[in-house]
Amino acid sequence: MKLLLTTAIATVSLIGYGRPAQESGSNPEPQIQAQKIQRVEEGKDEEPEISIHRAAWEGDPKVVEQCLINGKDVNAKDDLYGDTPLLWAAGFGNKEVVEMLITKGADVNAKAEEGWTPLHYATGGNDRGIAELLIDNGADLNAKNAGDQIAPLHWAAWRGHKEVAGLLIAKGAVVNAKNKNGGTPLHNATWKGHMEIVELLIANGADPNAKDAEGETPLNWVEEGKHKEIVDLLRKHGGKTGKELKAEGE
């Protein structure tokens, strides 16, 4: 389990989306916006501060649109993480830009270098509105990143995002999806002590005895995390430790 936890913690540090309010969805003042649009029209949009990715990050649909009018690729990848404008917009909670990019043909399943999708980013930011918009336009509910094989539901369970987790499940996400090390969303929710997520997952068919690569179940994880109320809930639904299952020949 230690390897799996290290991986999960690294993932938390990597994604880091769900920015403070002052950093997301904040349109520039009209004068600044007009200057940016003019520079884009003049073909000076190679500068980072007025690039299509920066405009998507800032939540500036007019500048994004002007970049596209000037021939910028709606699915262009940046040099930092291989993110497309849609990944930036989804990650920073800029729904208006997300909507516009989708109408302009943005790939809703575009992947960054590490395999994260716009839906992963929206889930990480606990943005139900953007998550639903992406799903309704074809986003893969069960897409996994390249290295750790983490699906959006793993991420929602880890971070305790109940509304987004509920949306993913309602739309058909696999509740017993396993990551690279065999961990399920229920493993994540139990370790972090997210009682409401645990209840939600179990109510929708999560296996309380799913084993990770080390043969440990959610009950093993929660007992290390010291969340007694979750231990009781898992036991109520037939949850056992890996050792108990092994003794029973399972």
Give, region by region, the residue ranges found by the protein language model.
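Leucine-rich solenoid repeat scaffolds
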Residues: 208-250
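Ankyrin repeat A-helix N-terminal signature
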Residues: 54-60, 88-94, 121-127, 155-161, ...
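Ankyrin repeat boundary/linker residues
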Residues: 45, 78-79, 112, 145-146, ...
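Intrinsically disordered, low-complexity regulatory segments in ankyrin-centric signaling systems
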Residues: 4, 16-70, 99, 103, ...
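Sec-dependent signal peptide recognition
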Residues: 2-8
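Ankyrin repeat (ANK) core detector
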Residues: 50-53, 84-87, 117-120, 150-154, ...
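Ankyrin repeat structural motif
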Residues: 60-68, 94-102, 127-135, 161-169, ...
